[in-house]
Structure formats: C-alpha cells, structure tokens
C-alpha cells in the first residue's frame, strides 16, 4: 500500500503577533491571526513533502471520474486527525451537504454554534469561495471539507489555519475553539487557502493572501479592519504590491489588487482562472490580462 508522507507542521515556535497573518474584521483589542503562512513556509522549506496536485491531468487520470463519497463522515463518528500541534481525537458533531464538523474530544461546542457554522458554510462561505476560487479537491474521497474545531492557544493569538502538508491526504481547515466569535471569517479565509493550494501550491503570498482577504470580504462585507488594511496601502501607495514584507499595507495592496482584477477582467470566472494558472505572480496575471473573460474592461480605463 502506498503511504503518503504527511508534514502537519509545527506551531511550537510560532509567534502569531510577529509571524501570523491577521484576519480581517477581528477586534483591535483582541487580535486573531492565521498560522497558514507560517505552516506553508515550513512546508516549502522542507521541499513540499507529500505534494499532490489533485487537478493535474496525471492525477485526474489515475482516479475514477465518479465521486463515490464512500469514506464520508457521519454524525457521531470518531477518529484521529493530524494537526499542527500533534494528533488529536475528534468526534463528528455535525454534517452538512459539503462539510463535516469535527470537534476535539473534551471540547464542548453548543449545538446552536454548530448549526450556525453548518448553515453559514452552506449558504455563504462554500458557494462564495468556490465561485471565485474553484471547486475543492476530494483526495480523501468523502465529499466533505473537514471543519476541525480544536484547542490551539486560548483566546486571541492563533485563530485557525490550513496546513498544506496535510492536504496530501485530506481537505481540512482548523479553527481554535477559543476564537469561535470569528469562526466564519476564519473559515472563509482558510478555505480559500485550501482551494488555492490545491491548484497552485507555488503561488506567491501577495496573490494568495490577497485572495484570502477577498474571500472574507465577498462572504461578509466591509468593516473597519478591512478599510484599515486598504488605507494602510493607500496612504503609502509607493509600496509595491509584489514586494511582500508582511506589513498591513501589503495585505491591503494584495486585497485591493485582486478585487481590481475581478472588477476589470471578468469577476469570479477570471479569479478562478488566475488561481488555476500554475504560472506564479505577475506571469499569471499577465496571462489573464491578455485573455480576459467576456465583457472585461481594458486595464487602465
């Protein structure tokens, strides 16, 4: 039997306030950060262990075109999940058409919260993200995105992540049980990272992070934190969108540039093509600009 190498990542030395990507819309007094950038950097520096390209012709030709969903989770199922903090035991507390909500054993999530996650996922997050960033892969053959609710680091700090090293065996996004107030924004953001990584794992941060902020905005609208990101770049627009340095202005630049491309070059269909293009950075954007969607507006007008 083929054993796929898994690199779940390590958060033991991760400092969210320094290395984390702050989520849009979270309160200034209680910042909540994504650990995805840190985990992706670890994965890249390790040489992309276990890399799978689920939309490549070779991979698609190796699998049946029919989705059997034979390994789907059912409510009440128990299992073990690899996380960036080690393996945890989980129980499926809720399922929906496109998700299974797995809760770390010993953690208590109210049924009203679980119901809200499932309904918001199906009504808003899943359709919005897939419209702009493409359909999800199904490497684990369960036809579900695993929404894994675990204890990470208490209130604030790391709110969630997508671990690219785990993507070789399953489709999972992780949320800290102590940051559930921001769960929907976290899920919209991290699901974009999952979708983007499945098509173009080598993409530059300024495009991937811009798209992740775009996912949160398209799902839940504008707030003061989003305008703060945008204004940080607007007040110093000499900063290049392509020169990524992890500053607030960098996130604002990436977000606004992706929104500009969607507005000019064809909306969700255009962004889907950008995400699916394995060319990176400016080369992928040039490819899109030279062959935009029907009804696109010329850049510069």
Question: Where would I find each of the regions flagged by the language model?
Answer:
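Juxtacatalytic substrate-recognition/specificity segment
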Residues: 95-215, 221-226, 233-243
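Active-site-proximal structural scaffolding
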Residues: 122, 205-208, 250-254, 267, ...
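N-terminal low-structure segments adjacent to metalloprotease catalytic domains
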Residues: 1-91
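Short helix/loop segments within enzyme catalytic domains
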Residues: 218-239, 262-279
